[in-house]
């Protein structure tokens, strides 16, 4: 069996980071909105449950959450987590959904109550007011903090290596121990280029929404 070359190994690790990044975004963005709505609920048990969830997740390290998701099912319920990638996805989605919910909160609360009252005067339901009047304003307001959180996510994907997931930094480290330094620099280039693309993308989105004054 031929040994894997550094470039093949880094490419494999790169794919892990990218998959973890996009799956986390795909699931955490809508879940964060659900958590935000639950926190605004008039049903107090649901309201306090969601707020307690956010408090716990934001108050504990992502690294700890990765270990809990990987080992807790087996230790508590004799149902071991067989896939380390799945464990990483669950931990990342839970963590980032909590942070996204707080970003949504800031955006929603920044919209004046007069906007809601104007919608009510026009005979709109609360759902119609949110999607037709509030949503675009919220999106414009949350783009800067959301972009920061998304860029942080790209770097946080490297934490998956602590549960044995062979992401790009773990792959680079293996070859560094063999006396090669360039895989580390290649890894740095990956993060710089990827985050550079995201920065350009979010900048483009902000410019596209400049017409919408809030």
Regions found by a protein language model. Give the residues of each.
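Transmembrane alpha-helices and adjacent helix-loop boundaries
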Residues: 1-214
